[in-house]
Amino acid sequence: MRYSVLTQQINRSLNNNPGEWDRLFVGKVRVAALNIARLQPHMRDLSIDPTLLKADIIHLCETWVCQDQESTARFELEGYTAHFINVGNGRGIATYSRGDFHHQQDVKEDDFQITKFSNGTLDSIHIYR
């Protein structure tokens, strides 16, 4: 399916009555979390999703990106800084942040992964187990 056709279909299915998520408020933070169930086949979906792209920080789990993957450059998302904890099949997390959010700390184990981002007044911690 062509990119423009897919985008039109997504926009057509959006609610015409915007909620809090859709309104821009100064001083508000939008945090999204999603089990992506393999990042590679869903990267394009992520890059054109108008709802997710309103988030200031996007936490994804079950990325399935291997530690020895040649590069995470193909998983970059325009307008966001990407951070990955690569563990392999069925595991791993990715965080896309923008604005004042910056990576602070990671915990990486085979059976769980944790990452922490902060904007100075708010910490966003993503735990996948």
Show the residue positions of the predicted features.
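A shared catalytic/ligand-binding motif for oxyanion handling
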Residues: 1-129
